[in-house]
């Protein structure tokens, strides 16, 4: 379409994760059909989100207070699970199988050779010292593996028990389509 306003909105909507050109066009035309009040509510929700959501001072969990409800909850056990994002942690929380606390690192280490000391290192070391077990739950990407190994080394240096989530074959998968690294991990982590 050759309309600068629609094209500009489509361009900006495509910056959202998982939104391609088709989805951005759909959202744009949906918004055009809405009355001004409804569009304003959406805009205000986004502005309020940016103004009021911040990181917990202890664990970096995104929420609206200086200290998140997980950190304040004294009934949680002495386990700490480390994630890259708050949304990853929430997915695990919704399972209802974990009653510990969380730490969000936000930035993965991208390259072993050029690994500068991550900004979160000191905060993690300080916070993790309060727990009996640290569980690393980063995505199994190359950067996730590099970061997991780094975290394991720095936390074991201060005598903390560190474990990682097991990796292996996903349910409903076929071995023929599984990459060699995942096959190897599933073999090594067999029960």
Curated annotation (Swiss-Prot):
CDD domains: TOPRIM_recR
Any GO molecular function: DNA binding
Keyword DNA damage: yes
PROSITE patterns named among the record's database cross-references: TOPRIM (PS50880)
Disulfide bonds: none
Keyword line: DNA damage, DNA recombination, DNA repair, Metal-binding, Zinc, Zinc-finger
Family annotation (InterPro entries): DNA_Rcmb_RecR, Rcmb_RecR, TOPRIM_dom, TOPRIM_RecR
GO biological process per UniProt: DNA recombination; DNA repair
Zinc finger (C4-type): 56-71
Domain Toprim: 78-170
Keyword Lyase: no
Function recorded in the entry: May play a role in DNA repair. It seems to be involved in an RecBC-independent recombinational process of DNA repair. It may act with RecF and RecO.
PANTHER family linked: RECOMBINATION PROTEIN RECR
Family assignment from sequence similarity: Belongs to the RecR family.
Name the record gives this protein: Recombination protein RecR
């Amino acid at each position: 379409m050759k309309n600068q306003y629609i094209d500009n909105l489509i361009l900006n909507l495509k910056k959202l994760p998982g939104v391609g050109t088709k989805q951005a066009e759909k959202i744009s035309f949906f918004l055009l059909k809405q009355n001004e009040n409804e569009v304003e509510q959406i805009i205000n929700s986004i502005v309020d989100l940016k103004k009021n959501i911040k990181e917990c001072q202890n664990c970096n969990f995104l929420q609206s207070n200086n200290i998140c409800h997980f950190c304040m909850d004294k009934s949680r056990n002495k386990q700490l699970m480390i994630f890259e994002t708050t949304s990853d942690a929430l997915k695990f929380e919704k399972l209802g199988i974990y009653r510990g606390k969380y730490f969000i690192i936000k930035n993965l280490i991208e390259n072993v050779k050029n690994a500068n000391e991550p900004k979160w290192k000191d905060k993690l070391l300080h916070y993790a010292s309060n727990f009996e077990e640290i569980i690393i739950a980063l995505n199994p990407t190359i950067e996730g593996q590099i970061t997991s190994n780094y975290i394991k080394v720095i936390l074991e240096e201060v005598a903390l028990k560190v474990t990682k989530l097991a990796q292996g074959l996903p349910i409903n998968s076929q071995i023929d389509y599984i990459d060699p690294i995942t096959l190897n991990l599933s073999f090594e982590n067999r029960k």
